[in-house]
């Protein structure tokens, strides 16, 4: 599998000039970051907007969040300098399990070290510094992207002016960890897994496909599956329509994603806890930036109680809602509603800034 085929031609690359130390104690050398930008950085370097992508996403935010960014949109490329980088550990251009290990000359594979959400954010910060960005007007992202958003607020308060964590939590729940582990076990059970030391020609495709089927079931909702499929039967495939749908999405992921990468990133998500041994409420209360926390009423993966908790504990937070039957994936589907939430939030920030200046 050549994952370069799924990276746009507009993608740029930054090569970290120094070794990158991981939170767990490991060190990566020759780290590469794949990223995209839209708009222009102003002379003050303070019009940055950072998009953080989810589990199987890439730096090509104009493809998976097309309605949210562009000229005169919520993330306005006429006004903002918008950045989206492929996260550490992914397979779309940034150093990860499919990358060549400079110490061995072969892909890392199963030897790629454990990483955390903080590691992802710290590497993004190195890119932001390289690009000459002095201030990020907004850091925004959903799901795994939302976890990065929260860590950005905590790690770099001097850079981040506002945040929008969407359909996410401050720490991964037992529910999410359990679902992730079941997906990983599906991959491990594939005969081609071989402890993660599989070949490019014979990856654990069936295991990864089943993992994706499990994930898709959690990304949607009872309402959406019932309304779309009910008990429809696919006579050609001789199975229920919902089975055909899930199998289709499983096979789609196999064509574009790597199993070791899936393991690495889901384990990083499971490690997510903004407190890390500190008092959870106090850590969230230390976030000083204005925050738009977005909840999805039908999300069974990161239920609204988790976003309500964030909005309750972050001092300057407001809770926005996506009323949708699409479940967790609504933040990638109901773009019109999400766009309006972001537009309203950014307008409120402008009004607040004007008020602060004139009073």
UniProtKB/Swiss-Prot annotation:
Top-rank taxon: Bacteria
Catalytic activity field: L-homoserine + acetyl-CoA = O-acetyl-L-homoserine + CoA
UniProt keywords, alphabetically: Acyltransferase, Amino-acid biosynthesis, Cytoplasm, Methionine biosynthesis, Transferase
Listed pathway(s): Amino-acid biosynthesis; L-methionine biosynthesis via de novo pathway; O-acetyl-L-homoserine from L-homoserine: step 1/1
Start and end residues of each AB hydrolase-1 domain: 49-332
Residues of the active site: 143 (nucleophile), 299, 328
Subcellular location: Cytoplasm
UniProt EC number: 2.3.1.31
GO cellular component terms listed in the entry, alphabetical order: cytoplasm
Signal peptide: none
Job description of the protein: Transfers an acetyl group from acetyl-CoA to L-homoserine, forming acetyl-L-homoserine.
PANTHER family, A to Z: HOMOSERINE O-ACETYLTRANSFERASE
NCBIfam families given in the database record: homoserO_Ac_trn (TIGR01392), PRK00175.1 (NF001209)
Protein name: Homoserine O-acetyltransferase
Lineage, uppermost ranks: Bacteria, Bacillati, Cyanobacteriota, Cyanophyceae, Nostocales
């Amino acid at each position: 599998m050549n994952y370069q085929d799924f990276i746009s031609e507009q993608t740029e690359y930054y090569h970290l000039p120094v070794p990158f130390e991981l939170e767990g104690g490991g060190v990566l050398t020759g780290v590469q970051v794949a990223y995209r930008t839209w708009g222009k950085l102003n002379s003050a370097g303070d019009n940055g907007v950072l998009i953080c992508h989810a589990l199987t996403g890439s730096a090509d935010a104009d493809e998976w969040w097309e309605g949210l960014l562009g000229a005169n949109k919520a993330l306005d490329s006429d006004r903002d300098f918008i950045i989206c980088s492929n996260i550490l550990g992914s397979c779309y251009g940034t150093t990860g399990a499919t990358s060549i290990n400079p110490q061995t000359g072969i892909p890392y594979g199963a030897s790629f070290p454990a990483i955390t959400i903080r590691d992802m954010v710290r590497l993004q910060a190195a890119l932001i510094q390289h690009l000459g960005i002095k201030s990020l007007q907004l850091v925004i992202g959903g799901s795994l992207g939302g976890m990065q958003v929260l860590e950005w607020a905590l790690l770099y308060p001097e850079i981040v002016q506002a945040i929008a964590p969407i359909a996410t939590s401050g720490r991964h729940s037992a529910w999410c960890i359990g679902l992730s582990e079941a997906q990983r076990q599906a991959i491990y059970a594939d005969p081609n897994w071989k402890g993660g030391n599989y070949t490019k020609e014979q990856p654990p495709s069936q295991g990864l496909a089943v993992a994706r089927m499990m994930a898709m079931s959690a990304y949607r909702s009872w309402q959406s599956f019932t309304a779309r499929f009910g008990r429809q039967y696919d006579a050609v495939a001789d199975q229920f329509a919902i089975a055909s749908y899930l199998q289709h999405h499983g096979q789609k992921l196999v064509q574009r994603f790597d199993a070791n990468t899936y393991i690495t990133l889901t384990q990083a998500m499971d490690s997510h806890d903004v407190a890390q041994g500190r008092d959870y409420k106090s850590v969230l209360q230390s976030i000083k930036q204005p925050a738009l926390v977005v909840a999805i009423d039908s999300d069974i993966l990161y239920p609204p109680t988790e976003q309500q908790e964030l909005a309750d504990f972050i001092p300057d937070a407001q809770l926005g809602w996506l009323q949708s039957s699409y479940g967790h994936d609504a933040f990638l589907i109901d773009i019109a509603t999400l766009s309006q939430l972001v537009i309203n939030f950014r307008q409120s920030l402008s009004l607040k800034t004007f008020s602060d200046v004139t009073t």
